[in-house]
């Protein structure tokens, strides 16, 4: 049985306004279970554009995308929304926590949306994720009362709540100082090593990328 979690086959993408420009060109690669992969390249090379395609948030592309060996349709948004909630965890540069809720509730929200477990089970799972990340003591604090580095760890716990097949990150350390960036890297590394969590992280930080299992480097919309 294959352990390929994510596969892109000949992905091409064009922007058409005001003129037709190719922004992704013949992108093909795969990521196996437990791999910690970084996606790097200069600003404007297509990293974030590719991540949006790989995450199923952008379906306007040519080629094929497979998640857990299943080809992703381009026209079925309700199916793709379920895939995003169930099989993909997202961590962005900005944490996007909801200040009106405490830390625990923020982590629970994607689990409640999935509607696979009871609220009590989702709460238990959320506390487990917070414990793994060493921030269970923050569970009842309001989201706007924790530090920037802590907020990003809360966002990682939230990304883990549904036990996703892959975590995708778009510059998750871009807003953090070196200490907190290293902390986030160590968390990702531990998730990969101990829990066989698959990760694909867009980063412009060379010191972050060089410590991952593999670097996919982009230039002018191509993998080089």
Predicted regions and their residues:
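The feature captures the beta-strand-to-loop junction immediately N-terminal to the Walker
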Residues: 40-42
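Helix-to-loop junction immediately C-terminal to a conserved catalytic motif
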Residues: 55
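Conserved ABC transporter NBD signature motif
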Residues: 63-74
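Short coil-to-helix segment of the ABC ATPase nucleotide-binding domain corresponding to the Q-loop/switch region
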Residues: 101-110
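Conserved ABC ATPase signature
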Residues: 142-150
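A short, proline-enriched helix->beta-strand linker immediately N-terminal to the Walker B motif
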Residues: 161-165
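Catalytic Walker B motif of ABC-type/P-loop ATPase nucleotide-binding domains
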Residues: 167-170
């Amino acid at each position: 049985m294959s352990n390929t979690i994510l596969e892109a086959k000949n992905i091409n993408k064009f922007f058409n306004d005001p003129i037709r420009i190719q922004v992704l060109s013949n992108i093909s690669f795969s990521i196996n279970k437990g791999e910690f992969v970084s996606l790097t390249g200069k600003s404007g090379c297509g990293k974030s554009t590719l991540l949006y395609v790989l995450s199923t948030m952008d379906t306007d592309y040519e080629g094929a995308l497979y998640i857990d060996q299943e080809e992703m349709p381009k026209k079925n948004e309700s199916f793709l929304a379920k895939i995003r909630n169930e099989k993909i965890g997202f961590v962005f540069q900005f944490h996007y926590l909801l200040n009106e809720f405490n830390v625990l509730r923020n982590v629970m929200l994607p689990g409640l949306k999935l509607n696979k477990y009871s609220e009590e089970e989702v709460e238990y799972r959320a506390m487990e994720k917070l414990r793994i990340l060493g921030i269970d003591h923050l569970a009842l604090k309001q989201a706007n009362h924790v530090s920037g580095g802590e907020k990003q760890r809360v966002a990682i716990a939230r990304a883990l709540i549904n036990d996703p097949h892959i975590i995708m990150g778009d510059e998750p350390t871009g807003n953090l100082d070196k200490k907190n960036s290293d902390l986030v890297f160590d968390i990702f590394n531990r998730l990969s090593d101990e829990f066989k969590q698959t990760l694909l992280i867009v980063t412009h930080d060379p010191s972050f990328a060089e410590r991952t299992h593999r670097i996919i480097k982009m230039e002018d919309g191509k993998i080089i």
